[in-house]
Amino acid sequence: MTKVLFVKANNRPAEQAVSVKLYEAFLASYKEAHPNDTVVELDLYKEELPYVGVDMINGTFKAGKGFDLTEEEAKAVAVADKYLNQFLEADKVVFGFPLWNLTIPAVLHTYIDYLNRAGKTFKYTPEGPVGLIGDKKIALLNARGGVYSEGPAAEVEMAVKYVASMMGFFGATNMETVVIEGHNQFPDKAEEIITAGLEEAAKVANKF
């Protein structure tokens, strides 16, 4: 049975957040099209995700080498392992997130930090790092009020670029991206822009 992990990184209600509308539309369409799949939702704002620090960094390194961990290191590693293992066990992973201040919410960055583990999501080789999750399907769902796909703002977009870059670093080669943008920049076209994006999300979800 296919396991699908939906990672939500926005705790605003759907009526206030286009990225949440996008996430919910994709989720509903996916469930309808894939009724036999096991779907797990991970709402990052409902989790306790401590920032990566000395205990987690030292602990994950020592654990990888088989060294003994301090009590605090063991606790930190257990937190990271919980989310890393869940990610690795999923056949497909869907990320729903907004662009805030040109990048992703801090909670999503912290979550991705947990996934970034040598020997698990990538490995070192003499030729450089090699990703290890190549067979995992990834979907990125993003909303941003301005236009960042082209024009002067394109070079400062660090939300989709960052998540896609990290998944690529982990070896993902099968990625779908649905972006709704410009609804704040062009308020007279906002309804049209959002509707088109939600329709696109439903189409992608059906085939994902």
From Swiss-Prot:
Its cofactor is FMN. Belongs to the azoreductase type 1 family. SUPFAM superfamilies: Flavoproteins (SSF52218). The keyword NAD applies. The gene is azoR4. Keywords: Flavoprotein, FMN, NAD, Oxidoreductase. It comes from Bacillus anthracis. Homodimer. Gene3D superfamilies: 3.40.50.360. The lineage of its organism: Bacteria, Bacillati, Bacillota, Bacilli, Bacillales. Its EC number is 1.6.5.-, 1.7.1.17. It is an enzyme of class 1 (oxidoreductase). It catalyses: 2 a quinone + NADH + H(+) = 2 a 1,4-benzosemiquinone + NAD(+); N,N-dimethyl-1,4-phenylenediamine + anthranilate + 2 NAD(+) = 2-(4-dimethylaminophenyl)diazenylbenzoate + 2 NADH + 2 H(+). Quinone reductase that provides resistance to thiol-specific stress caused by electrophilic quinones. Binds 1 FMN per subunit. One of its GO terms (molecular function) is FMN binding. This is FMN-dependent NADH:quinone oxidoreductase 4.
